[in-house]
């Protein structure tokens, strides 16, 4: 007995086999005491089932109030409503369950759709929508006072939560372009076009952005989607029609471009008429194109773009004095525009005019250094004349001024290095730019252009094995723009890699069999370079089946086919007769 009393757990009068129980935690747990030492805890499920709704209600109210306090006072969102906060938690749970079997993109689209239908309702989506509107207002106020850090902080979330707010989408897309995230920007603009069917300015911004980064395929797809939509305003329809026709022209699909011009009567406008003239010019019918352009200038005397095109064509034809007259007229008509000044550089060729060109370049940079397109045109002039110092200077200027299209300046500079014969520097610069691409977004066309230039640089630098591997990768990519392949072939010819150049031309035609511009350029390259002209007849026949080649091309082909090289070629005489017939 004395031993038991010494035990600290001993309870006087309670034996080791005695049992008793008592509830704790509001009766949800029962404690069963066996003897004076052993205690067993077991849940009381009936009591738990009875009290759990009460606890869940208390928890829901507490979390809702905490969330309301956080959003309303800590995050400073004055549009926060207590009713939304009380529905926020149940909506979140329901969303989580509904999204279990959905992918990331499906969840994003589902959430976006809900935000479009909750303007006058309550709950999680309604709160997020109101929160987005508030963030957009904060971002716009920050932009007005030039607080760009705060603007960038709020506009992204604001635009995401208000998908139908076109101004927010535009501002956020501009920010994405500025931060070198064009893919995100295009996605944002394209998803919001459905709300801009009566807003021509919004569509025009999208069209301009597509042309800025050579997104012809993207623009053609968008035009196909909205041209048949009766809800789209006539003004937007007209813009999409001419934009799609121009995109087809830039891709070399002359037949499709002419089809759109005829279908929508685009040649009744100055832009459409000019486009038809451009197609004739690029097809080789240059005298007819120039005559039609002169007729257009008589009909549209205020057509600045018509006069600009005439100056460019006269320059290409070698009529520099007449081109200068056109530029003088442009300078008088548009004294504040950079075009005439920059175009005048092309009229000062050769080393004797180097100092005059340098003076014009300095003047252009000093006067128009903040205009991105003007500086890009100036960089392209530097590329055509292989002035590496000029393209490098403008690439640095683009970084300093934080131009939206900075990567295009880098691309022009890389091509200029290659044109100047500095292949090793080209490779090193592209490798360095690829490190930058890990931070920025590049559209696929830009990446493929860099790949093509680096591939050619490997050949020019004597690294033929690496060049061959990269060339095979490039040609296996079915999405490479045709002009990238044609340009690559030209540069391979300059590097005297004729076999590789011919392989690229073959691939360019296989990937773009209906492309008249590609076929015409292939024929012209084969006429100019006998080393790749073994299959000239094949491509010439295909070109003649698609459209009538220019007189100059036919005459050059006639001379080439009359040479001894094609003496034993099959059907040579038939082809010669066909060419002579077209020349009559």
Show the residue positions of the predicted features.
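Long, contiguous interaction/recruitment modules in multidomain scaffold/adaptor proteins
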Residues: 5-128, 219, 233-235, 250, ...
């Amino acid at each position: 007995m004395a031993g038991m009393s010494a035990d600290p757990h001993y309870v006087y009068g309670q034996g080791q086999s005695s049992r008793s129980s008592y509830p704790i935690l509001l009766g949800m747990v029962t404690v069963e005491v066996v003897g004076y030492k052993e205690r067993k805890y077991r849940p009381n499920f009936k009591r738990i089932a009875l009290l759990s709704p009460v606890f869940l209600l208390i928890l829901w109210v507490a979390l809702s109030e905490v969330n309301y306090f956080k959003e309303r006072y800590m995050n400073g969102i004055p549009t926060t409503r207590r009713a939304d906060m009380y529905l926020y938690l149940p909506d979140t749970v329901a969303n989580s369950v509904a999204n279990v079997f959905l992918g990331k993109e499906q969840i994003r689209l589902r959430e976006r759709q809900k935000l479009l239908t909750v303007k006058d309702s309550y709950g999680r989506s309604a709160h997020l929508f109101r929160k987005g509107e508030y963030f957009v207002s904060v971002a716009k106020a920050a932009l007005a006072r030039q607080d760009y850090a705060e603007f960038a902080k709020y506009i992204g979330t604001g635009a995401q939560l208000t998908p139908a707010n076109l101004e927010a989408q535009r501002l956020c897309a501009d920010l994405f372009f500025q931060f070198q995230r064009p893919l995100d920007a295009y996605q944002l603009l394209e998803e919001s076009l459905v709300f801009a069917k009566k807003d021509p300015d919004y569509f025009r911004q999208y069209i301009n952005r597509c042309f800025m980064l050579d997104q012809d395929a993207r623009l053609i797809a968008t035009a196909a989607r909205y041209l048949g939509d009766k809800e789209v305003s006539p003004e937007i329809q007209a813009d999409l029609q001419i934009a799609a026709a121009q995109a087809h022209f830039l891709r070399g699909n002359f037949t499709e471009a002419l089809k759109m011009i005829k279908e929508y009567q685009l040649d009744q406008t100055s832009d459409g008429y000019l486009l038809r003239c451009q197609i004739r010019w690029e097809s080789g019918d240059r005298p007819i194109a120039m005559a039609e352009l002169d007729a257009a200038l008589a009909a549209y005397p205020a057509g600045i773009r018509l006069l600009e095109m005439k100056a460019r064509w006269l320059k290409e034809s070698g009529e520099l004095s007449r081109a200068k007259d056109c530029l003088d007229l442009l300078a008088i008509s548009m004294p504040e525009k950079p075009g005439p000044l920059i175009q005048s550089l092309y009229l000062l060729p050769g080393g004797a005019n180097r100092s005059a060109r340098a003076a014009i370049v300095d003047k252009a940079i000093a006067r128009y250094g903040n205009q991105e397109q003007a500086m890009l045109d100036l960089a392209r002039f530097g590329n055509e004349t292989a002035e590496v110092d000029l393209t490098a200077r403008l690439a640095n200027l683009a970084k300093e001024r934080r131009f939206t299209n900075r990567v295009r300046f880098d691309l022009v500079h890389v091509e200029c290095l290659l044109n100047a014969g500095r292949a090793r520097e080209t490779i090193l610069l592209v490798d360095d730019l690829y490190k930058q691409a890990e931070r920025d977004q590049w559209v696929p066309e830009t990446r493929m252009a860099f790949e093509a230039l680096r591939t050619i640089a490997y050949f020019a630098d004597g690294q033929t094995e690496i060049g061959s591997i990269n060339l095979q990768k490039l040609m296996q990519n079915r999405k490479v723009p045709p002009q990238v392949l044609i340009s690559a072939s030209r540069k391979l010819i300059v590097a005297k890699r004729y076999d590789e150049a011919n392989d690229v031309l073959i691939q360019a035609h296989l990937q773009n069999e209906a492309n008249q511009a590609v076929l015409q350029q292939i024929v012209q390259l084969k006429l100019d370079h006998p080393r790749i002209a073994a299959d000239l007849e094949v491509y010439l026949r295909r070109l003649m089946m698609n459209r009538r080649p220019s007189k100059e091309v036919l005459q050059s082909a006639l001379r080439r086919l009359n040479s001894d090289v094609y003496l034993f070629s099959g059907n040579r005489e038939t082809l010669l007769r066909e060419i002579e017939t077209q020349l009559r």
